[in-house]
Amino acid sequence: MHFRTVNTPARLQFISRFVLQPLRPLLHYKDHTIRTAAEAGLDVAELAVGPAFVVARGYFTLRQADTSSAESRDPTKQQQLWEKTLEWLGMTEEQGAL
């Protein structure tokens, strides 16, 4: 067995290759948004710089405008996330203002 050099533990590489990959068609049938990192990365790049998305803003699923979860739109949760982010970065509210 020859894995590429990555910082992923060997056990996790094994599970990914021999358990998750064979089950991928089944997982995709259950949830059509399940994709590889490479596939998702192409969408992110297209959304970031693609001509079709120059004026696009918001939340997207598979390059289609979508509504994010109710939890992500909750102002209290947003504030908690912002405060935790500042804490983890060791920043103050003043340093975090955009």
From Swiss-Prot:
| Domain of life according to the entry | Eukaryota
GO MF annotation, one = oxidoreductase activity
Q: Which UniProt keywords apply?
A: Oxidoreductase
| Pathway(s) this gene product operates in, as recorded in its UniProt entry | Secondary metabolite biosynthesis
EC number(s) stated in the UniProt entry for this protein: 1.-.-.-
Tell me the function of this protein. Dehydrogenase; part of the gene cluster that mediates the biosynthesis of aculins. The pathway begins with the synthesis of 6-methylsalicylic acid by the polyketide synthase (PKS) acuA via condensation of acetate and malonate units. The 6-methylsalicylic acid decarboxylase acuB then catalyzes the decarboxylation of 6-methylsalicylic acid to yield m-cresol (also known as 3-methylphenol). These first reactions occur in the cytosol.
Descriptive protein name: Dehydrogenase acuH
